[in-house]
UniProtKB/Swiss-Prot annotation:
Domain Helicase ATP-binding stretches: 125-301
Name of the protein: DEAD-box ATP-dependent RNA helicase 38
Family: Belongs to the DEAD box helicase family. DDX19/DBP5 subfamily.
Modified-residue entries (N-acetylalanine), positions: 2
Reaction catalysis annotation: ATP + H2O = ADP + phosphate + H(+)
EC top class named in words: hydrolase
Highest classification ranks of the organism: Eukaryota, Viridiplantae, Streptophyta, Embryophyta, Tracheophyta
Length: 496
């Protein structure tokens, strides 16, 4: 579809400002009824102001990247357009009529060479008038964040000191990460951004009644954003574009549906012509049907369920006689034998996190853990250290399963399979997001699922395989060094 139709050009405002500003506005969290869940998803905030000098806007040849990573080949993206607006797939960023400032950000700061497949198809849909809504699903690591960040930046008028783009995320970590991407990509534009998440400092004064926000882009979590709107801190009159990152979770009944719908309705009362972008790696049928009823006449991009798992990531399952054997598999087999970059180990409980942490730390690995006993500022510090490669292993509940982007991660271990708290049934969306933490942007990677030989873990794994129509290879003997060597070689984590 997208390769054969004609594109209507968009005019993008360029900026005369010589700086880009980004500030984090924080808010004290109020007591709420604790939600029963295995993970501890909430939010994140590490106050950092990035002010960059605008140098020459010309892009020097030596500053362009020499090569591009192989992205997942989303060859089975199904595109359904609404209306008669023609679109042309963008094979180059030059095809998008972007400002010189944004082009420099893409090439010099982001080190991009060309759009990934999801970017090539979705960006013309986002930027072409009449700016129709978009529901977009694509592989983890395929470049979805760039789609909506570039979409927001391209539609902002830097001369108007009012909020014009809003991005809503389910966690603090994801909001921070999206802010970092926006700061890099928009470094030369003069576009300002503000972070709306709960304060990481316990007892800090609430920021709900502060001065009205004048930043062009606001990125935050739904609870804080809803309060800002209620206290008139966040003006909606000039809002052009609303983004839901991890939209399946934002609009699920057990997620943030009520808050998300209220925000959409409040914006619609003031500015009915705003554009809605919904991005996620997963959309179950219930959420997909709900979105179709809620968002009017959207363009849609979807990937078949069986095509969602990344081919570059090899998945394995290991049946262990006892819990202690899982730790032995991690430290004596996988970590000891493989050529491992960085590793994320997903656990169900804080007790498991502490147990695995202790075992690996005693082996001399640089290990950190993220779980519910930590303050937000401690979580921020740990995630930041991992992203800066100061630590090798991160043990976590599902707080970072969604959207966490660290390209050096090539190993994911499911110490516990993801299941739903209420029913114990497999959480398919969380499994897919976990797998997506390895092999970012087509890099090689491996996922090891550690199962107890009690029947239940095996049943959960079988349901996951059936759901994704995938056969996960089994390591027949949990303590066979040769089998692990063979698996690691196959995954590209051990030289021949």
């Amino acid at each position: 579809m997208a390769d054969t139709v004609e594109k209507v050009p968009t005019v993008v405002e360029s900026s005369s400002s010589s700086t880009v500003e980004a500030s984090n506005s924080a808010e004290k969290t109020e007591p709420t009824t604790e939600k029963k869940k295995w993970g501890d998803v909430e939010d994140d905030d590490d106050e950092e102001e990035a002010v960059s000098e605008l140098n020459s806007l010309s892009i020097k040849e030596e500053e362009k990247p020499d090569s591009i990573l192989e992205e997942p080949e989303d060859s089975n993206i199904k595109a359904v357009t609404s209306g008669d607006t023609p679109y042309t797939s963008a094979s180059r960023f030059e095809d998008l009529n972007l400002s010189p400032e944004l082009m420099k950000g893409l090439y010099v700061e982001m080190k991009f060479e060309k759009p990934s497949k999801i970017q090539a198809i979705s960006l013309p849909m986002i930027m072409t008038p009449p700016h129709k809504h978009l529901i977009a699903q694509a592989h983890n690591g395929s470049g979805k964040t760039t789609c909506f960040v570039l979409g927001m930046l391209s539609r902002v008028d830097p001369t108007l000191r009012e909020p014009q783009a809003l991005c809503i995320c389910p966690t603090r970590e994801l909001a921070n990460q999206n802010m970092e991407v926006l700061q890099k990509m928009g470094k030369f534009t003069g576009i300002t951004a503000e972070l709306a998440v709960p304060d990481s400092t316990r007892g800090a004064p609430a920021a709900t009644r502060g001065a009205p926000v004048s930043a062009h882009v606001v990125i935050g979590t739904p609870g804080t954003l809803k309060k800002w709107m209620a206290f008139k801190r966040l003006g909606l009159n000039h809002l052009k574009i609303l983004v839901f990152d991890e939209a399946d979770h934002m609009l699920a009944t057990d997620g943030f549906r009520d808050d998300s719908l209220k925000i959409m309705k409040d914006i619609g009362r003031v500015n009915p012509n705003f554009q809605v972008l919904l991005f996620s790696a997963t959309f179950n049928e219930t959420v997909k049907d709900f979105v179709a009823r809620t968002v009017k006449d959207p363009n849609q991009l979807f990937v078949k369920r069986e095509d969602l798992a990344l081919d570059s990531v090899k998945q394995y399952k290991v049946v262990c006689p006892k819990e202690q054997n899982k730790i032995e598999v991690i430290k004596d087999q996988i970590m000891e034998l493989g050529d491992i970059g960085q590793t994320i180990i997903f656990v169900k409980t804080k007790a498991s996190a502490q147990k695995v942490h202790k075992a690996l730390a005693e082996m001399g690995y640089d290990v950190t853990s993220v779980h519910g006993n930590l303050t937000e500022s401690d979580r921020d510090k740990i995630v930041k250290e991992f992203k800066e490669c100061l630590t090798q292993v991160l043990i976590a509940t599902d707080v970072i399963a969604r959207g966490f982007d660290q390209q050096r991660v090539n190993l994911v271990v499911n110490y516990n399979l993801p299941t739903k708290y209420e029913t114990g049934e497999p959480d398919y969306e969380v499994y897919l997001h976990r797998v997506g933490r390895a092999g970012r942007f087509g890099r090689k990677g491996a996922v090891f699922n550690l199962l107890l030989d009690d029947g239940w873990d095996k049943e959960v794994m079988e349901k996951i395989e059936k759901y994704f129509e995938a056969n996960v290879k089994e390591i027949k003997s949990w303590n066979s060094e040769e089998e692990y060597k063979s698996a690691l070689k196959e995954a590209g984590l051990l030289d021949e």
